[in-house]
Regions:
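N-terminal metal-binding scaffold of metallo-dependent hydrolase/deaminase domains
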Residues: 1-44, 55-56, 477-483
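Divalent metal-coordination and catalytic microenvironments
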Residues: 9, 26, 31, 54, ...
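Active-site gating loops and adjacent loop-to-helix segments of metal-dependent hydrolytic enzymes
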Residues: 72-109, 164-175, 233-261, 332-360
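Alpha-helical scaffold segments that flank or form the walls of functional sites
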Residues: 76-131, 136-153, 178-191, 453-455, ...
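Metal-coordinating catalytic core of metallo-dependent amide/deamination hydrolases
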Residues: 134, 139-273
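His/Asp/Glu-enriched, well-ordered alpha-helical/loop segment
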Residues: 254-261, 301-399
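C-terminal cap of metal-dependent C-N hydrolases
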Residues: 389-449
């Protein structure tokens, strides 16, 4: 007998044939999809039947670029705007980031990260990435990963090693010391849902660039993938200062970083000849659309698609994209490509081939199937097919903000251009219902919010961070508004 049978749904499978059942079913048994198809082929018996009339059943989303502790900094963009120089903005935020995270031990980090995970689950994410590089408190990563385990989500979690002039001494460590921590965390948290890997924050965070080679070798020794935040906001200036005339992909290759499978965050400012290499590598990319509005460069997603690469999509945490909604992210991805194409045309480049312009279908594929591939989880999730894990969501389109559908002919467009996080009704991971009617089944949401608020208030008081916050308190004025 089937455990859960979802009936009368508009089913987007993301399977090899990209089948869409306009009135279909999904059956789950023992945490896996038992069948998916038309209603006439639905199993007759099930322990639980969910009538999904008016809802879309589809694979869960994957947030493929994230920093879980940075949920603590939501609305920081309001403090620092306008951002006209991204490298300078990054330097300024690191100062605040290390001030706060120096007081985030395991227990505190767990409470902060729970809130971020709760937000993501309610948005429809079933898997997340993490690059944890704030390791002044050595058990901070434990707290973050414990929260992921507790949430029921899947995670591709990179414990990063950083050093160099931009890093406080207390946060700096060698590749060898970092790999010891990674191995400890892998032993503690690796499971069928969580994979912990070594991480390279990016090429600018190493006192000794050879540490990148050491991390690759360490990953190989422990049978692990490697995480690289592949972005160069300096647009080649850092590499030129080091006497390297190539691009960042070539720079990483020179240290052996790409000798095995890697997660590659952002892939920002790759050279044209580097795009041509992508089809020859097992490098899985995540794009972050909101950042490309910060610097005005747009997203060159068409260059990835031209090489047969379907990237995932990431938010880069609430410090960057305050709104974690995957629907908002998909919209911004399409708009960011438009921004990039306009820039490239002004530079004399050709427009993309028609097949490489983004559509609603393409960004939905990126946010689900592409995300699972980017996080090395496409063998278990990313599509609805028999034998895969029961990782799926129900999105309620029977609402004013997502109507009319014109007899379902605009459903993909509604998902991308109109849906909100509040459209997500139900979230399953491995067949377990983690969100039901928009609410968590594992956590008391009010307690999660209150715990995070209290921890952050305590840290702000201990560090003086409260003085860095906008003075929007009674008796104060700020930006010509008076607070009483």
């Amino acid at each position: 007998m089937t455990d859960t049978l979802i009936t009368n749904a508009y089913v987007i499978t993301m399977d090899e044939g990209r089948r869409v059942f306009t009135s279909g079913h999904v059956a789950i048994k023992d945490g896996k999809i038992a069948s998916v198809g038309q209603m006439k082929d639905a199993p007759k018996d099930a322990k639980t039947v969910l009538d999904a009339r008016g809802k879309v059943a589809m694979p869960g989303f994957a947030n493929t670029h994230n920093h879980l502790v940075q949920g603590a900094f939501r609305a920081y963009n309001d403090d620092r705007w306008p951002v006209l120089d991204l490298p300078t903005a990054v330097r300024n935020l690191l100062k605040q980031l290390f001030t706060m995270t120096a007081r985030m031990d395991g227990e505190r980090t767990q409470k902060i990260v729970r809130l971020h995970l709760l937000d993501m689950l309610k948005c429809g994410y079933t898997a997340t990435h993490d690059e944890h590089f704030t390791n002044i408190c050595k058990d901070s990563a434990d707290g973050a990963y414990e929260a992921v385990k507790e949430s029921g989500m899947r995670g591709f979690l990179a414990r990063c090693v950083i050093s160099g002039e931009r890093v406080p001494q207390a946060a700096s460590e060698s590749a060898e010391a970092g790999l010891i921590e990674v191995e400890r965390l892998r032993g503690k948290y690796n499971s069928d849902r969580i994979e912990v890997v070594p991480g390279i924050l990016n090429l600018s965070f190493f006192a000794d660039p050879q540490d990148m080679r050491r991390l690759r070798e360490g990953a190989d020794r422990m049978g692990s993938r490697l995480d690289v935040d592949m972005t160069d906001n300096s647009r080649g200036a850092i590499l030129k200062a080091r006497g390297f005339e190539g691009g960042q992909l070539e720079y990483y290759e020179s240290f052996g970083v790409l000798d095995g499978p890697i997660y590659a965050g952002k892939g920002h400012e790759l050279l044209p000849r580097e795009f041509a290499r992508l089809g020859q590598l097992d490098a899985r990319f995540s794009l972050v659309p909101v950042l490309r509005f910060f610097d005005g460069r747009g997203l060159p997603v068409h260059h990835f698609l031209a090489q047969g690469v379907l990237p995932g999509l990431g938010t880069d945490a609430p410090m960057v994209a305050d709104c974690q909604s995957p629907f908002e992210m998909m919209r911004k991805t399409i708009l960011a490509q438009n921004l990039c194409v306009k820039r490239e045309q002004a530079e004399g480049l050709d427009r993309p081939a028609p097949a490489h312009w983004l559509t609603s279908e393409t960004v939905l594929e990126m946010a689900t199937l592409g995300g699972a591939h980017t996080l090395f989880k496409d063998d278990v999730s990313g599509s609805l097919a028999p034998g895969k894990a029961g990782d799926l969501i129900l999105v309620d389109l029977a609402k004013a903000e997502t109507a009319p559908s014109h007899a379902n002919r605009r459903v993909p467009g509604l998902l991308v251009w109109a849906a909100q996080s509040s459209s997500v009704d139900t979230v399953f991971v491995a067949g377990e219902k983690l969100i039901e009617a928009g609410r968590s089944t594992r956590w008391n949401e009010d307690e999660i919010i209150a715990d995070a608020e209290q921890v952050l208030a305590d840290i702000a008081a201990e560090t003086g961070y409260a003085e860095m916050l906008p003075p929007r308190t009674p008796g104060q004025s700020f930006r010509q508004w008076n607070y009483l």
